[in-house]
């Protein structure tokens, strides 16, 4: 077989770093071009299970609870679209070595600086390679952030972000025709970040750290160019790095389908690791941040629920979905979360802890519908206080002019002079909606401090407290009567459903509930999946009733 002398002369086009090699035999002459490009990080799924989409994160098992959040973790090969090309030309001066192997034997090496349209070989080194025709070779390139140890290439953790190694096999032609050898220099390390995911917009940026929970994070790896594999040489604990993340940028309310899935995100910075690193062995410590009601501070002990090993050039997000942890009133009069009280029975959801106000998880009368007042009163005002039907900010008709549903139900002075019989409307059958709320009893019964407590028909103000707390309606909104208030309606519903209660949004017919506010007749609240509004209705209409309680 005739040997050819391949003389390496690096030339470059606008988008490639190409080494043009002239094959100068006695009777023939051909060219072989080596094309070296650098790769961006890739979506490399090293896990066998299927990817968990946003809408299915709901089913992940709870890992821990921090403040008012139920936390799970899940790793994904990062699917964020990178607008850059998958590979790019080397435009800044970068030192590379190219080794050529025939089988397990190194038969040549080139070394120099690539930049723009030029290749400058290292002083005292050759720019020529002797290669056989019609022979298969393995080409390996690596930059100066990779250390050579014999044939093996070593990378330390400190260089995980910048070290690059490329590998390609190529068979030379037998007829001297021109061919292209493409080598893609890939990251020898991988990158990992945290992605906090919430069911509503994030209201306070996160301050946190990223560290390991074990001392077995690879700190040095060896790459075998012949087997194309990495081996861990040493391990240690991963020193804590800053992991702060910003407010979410998704549109309020719609960004999560009004609380239906964790669509609001706060991504931390990238942390660079070596191949073979297990994301299961990382943790996050949060000192500040807020999604729901409270500041979040605590430890997330592992960023993957099970082993998840990263690969070289991979990019990964440790997703941290956070659900709200609601506060419930239990049948014995105590309050707390469901997880902390597994043997207790919830009877109501706390909607304002300062006022000790809670809404029953069940409907009065098992979902029966009631009129606001008896037909004999017609459309005459039976309440001592009437909310006018003019436009006004919510602060005027709720806080300034608002009243307590407890008073409306149990205080005789809230009834007008035309009320016949008992002026306490909660005890007067002429006011079926009031009467149903006042005589509501949870199906599990009550004990302890709840014995003797009175349930009542909530006012519009009481309902407003509920939608602010459970649906995260913003108090800063200034809207008039009949105007809808945006809310995370599915988070509002979740509070009742998680405790086994009856949701408000059962169907189109049952989204309307009576309030005790007399607004040009009977006042009602309309609860939608995306919003709520407060308005009036003729008192002989029939709607459902949800009882509230002061515990």
Question: What residues fall within each predicted segment?
Answer:
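Residues that flank catalytic or metal-binding motifs in active/ligand-binding sites
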Residues: 94, 188-190, 353-355, 453, ...
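Active-site-proximal beta-strand/loop segments in catalytic clefts of secreted hydrolases
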Residues: 37-39, 359-364, 458-463, 516-518
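Residues within well-ordered beta-strands of beta-sheet-rich folds
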Residues: 140-142, 193-195, 358-360, 454-456, ...
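Sec-type signal peptide cleavage vicinity
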Residues: 12-326, 346, 378-416
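An exposed tryptophan-centered "aromatic clamp" motif
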Residues: 430-454, 460-529, 550
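Sec-dependent bacterial lipoprotein signal peptides
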Residues: 1-16
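Extracellular adhesion/carbohydrate-recognition regions
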Residues: 317-443, 451, 537-548
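Mature exported/compartmentalized surface modules and terminal targeting/interaction regions
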Residues: 301, 306-328, 508-510, 516-538, ...
């Amino acid at each position: 077989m005739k040997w050819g002398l391949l003389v390496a002369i690096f030339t470059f086009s606008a988008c490639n770093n190409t080494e043009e090699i002239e094959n100068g035999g006695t009777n023939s002459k051909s060219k072989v071009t080596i094309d070296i490009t650098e790769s961006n990080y890739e979506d490399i799924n090293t896990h066998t299970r299927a990817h968990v989409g946003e809408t299915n994160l709901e089913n992940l098992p709870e890992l821990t609870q921090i403040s008012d959040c139920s936390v799970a973790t899940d790793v994904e090969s990062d699917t964020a679209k990178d607008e850059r090309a998958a590979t790019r030309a080397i435009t800044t001066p970068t030192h590379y070595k190219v080794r050529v192997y025939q089988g397990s034997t190194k038969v040549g090496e080139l070394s120099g600086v690539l930049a723009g349209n030029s290749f400058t070989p290292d002083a005292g080194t050759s720019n020529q390679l002797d290669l056989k025709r019609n022979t298969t070779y393995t080409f390996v390139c690596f930059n100066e952030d990779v250390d050579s140890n014999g044939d093996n290439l070593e990378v330390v953790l400190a260089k995980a972000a910048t070290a690059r190694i490329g590998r390609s096999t190529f068979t030379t032609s037998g007829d001297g025709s021109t061919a292209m050898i493409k080598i893609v220099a890939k990251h020898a390390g991988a990158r990992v970040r945290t992605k906090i995911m919430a069911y509503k917009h994030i209201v306070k940026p996160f301050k946190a750290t990223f560290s390991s929970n074990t001392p077995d994070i690879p700190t040095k790896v060896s790459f075998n160019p012949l087997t194309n594999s990495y081996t861990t040489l040493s391990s240690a604990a991963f020193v804590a790095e800053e992991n702060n993340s910003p407010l979410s940028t998704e549109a309020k309310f719609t960004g999560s389908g009004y609380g239906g899935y964790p669509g609001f995100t706060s991504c931390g910075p990238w942390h660079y690791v070596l191949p073979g690193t297990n994301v299961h062995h990382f943790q996050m410590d949060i000192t500040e941040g807020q999604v729901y009601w409270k500041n979040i501070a605590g430890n997330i002990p592992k960023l993957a629920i099970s082993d998840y090993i990263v690969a070289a050039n991979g990019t990964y997000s440790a997703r941290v979905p956070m659900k709200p942890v609601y506060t419930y009133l239990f049948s014995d009069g105590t309050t707390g979360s469901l997880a902390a009280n597994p043997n207790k029975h919830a009877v109501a959801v706390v909607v304002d802890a300062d006022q000790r106000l809670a809404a029953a998880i069940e409907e009065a009368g098992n979902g029966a519908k009631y009129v606001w007042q008896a037909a004999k009163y017609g459309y005459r005002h039976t309440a001592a206080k009437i909310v006018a039907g003019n436009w006004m900010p919510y602060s005027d008709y709720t806080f300034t002019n608002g009243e307590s549903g407890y008073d409306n139900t149990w205080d005789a002075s809230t009834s007008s002079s035309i009320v016949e019989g008992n002026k306490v409307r909660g005890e007067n059958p002429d006011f079926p909606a009031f009467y149903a709320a006042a005589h509501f009893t949870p199906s599990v019964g009550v004990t302890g401090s709840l014995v003797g407590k009175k349930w009542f028909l909530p006012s519009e103000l009481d309902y407003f407290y509920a939608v602010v707390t459970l649906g995260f309606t913003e108090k800063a909104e200034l809207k008039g009567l009949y105007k809808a208030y945006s809310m995370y309606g599915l988070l509002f519903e979740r509070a009742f459903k998680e405790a086994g209660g009856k949701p408000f949004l059962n169907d189109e017919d049952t989204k309307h509930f009576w309030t005790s506010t007399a607004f040009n007749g009977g006042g009602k609240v309309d609860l939608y999946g995306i919003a709520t509004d407060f308005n009036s209705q003729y008192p002989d209409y029939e709607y459902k009733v949800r009882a509230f309680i002061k515990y």
